[in-house]
Curated annotation (Swiss-Prot):
It is found in: Cytoplasm; Nucleus. Keywords: Cytoplasm, Iron, Metal-binding, Nucleus, Oxidoreductase. It comes from Encephalitozoon cuniculi (strain GB-M1). Transmembrane segments: none annotated. It catalyses: [3Fe-4S](1+)-[protein] + Fe(2+)-[Dph3] = [3Fe-4S](0)-[protein] + Fe(3+)-[Dph3]; 2 [3Fe-4S](0)-[protein] + 2 Fe(2+)-[Dph3] + NADH = 2 [4Fe-4S](1+)-[protein] + 2 [Dph3] + NAD(+) + H(+). The gene is DPH3. The DPH-type metal-binding (MB) domain can also bind zinc. However, iron is the physiological binding partner as zinc binding impairs the protein electron donor function. Pathway: Protein modification; peptidyl-diphthamide biosynthesis. This is Diphthamide biosynthesis protein 3.
Length: 93
């Protein structure tokens, strides 16, 4: 399965961040991904998920514990919204 067509289509849409009542609404996320779908590195204490550009989205355990939801790809401008509950992180502490 290739993400390339979706990847190109994403940029054609011209996604932009919007703020509604102080919260992000469709902040240009490429996708929403459940934390259970991420791969976890105990050494780096970081979660990884494949990016369509060939690299990986990443978000640290510390960021998640601080309420962050944005996982970023270091090679391109895509971001995903990480979906999780506090109890999902307990096994990684």
């Amino acid at each position: 399965m290739s993400f390339r067509p979706e990847y190109k289509e994403y940029f054609k849409q011209g996604a932009t961040a919007r703020i509604y009542n102080g919260a992000f609404e469709d902040a240009g996320f490429y996708d929403e991904v459940d934390i259970k779908e991420f791969e976890y590195s105990r050494e780096e204490k970081t979660f990884y998920y494949p990016c369509p550009c060939g690299d990986r989205f990443e978000i640290s355990l510390e960021d998640l514990r601080n309420g962050e939801v944005v996982a970023r790809c270091p090679s391109c401008s895509l971001i995903v919204c990480t979906v999780y509950e506090a109890e999902d992180l307990e096994k990684y502490l």
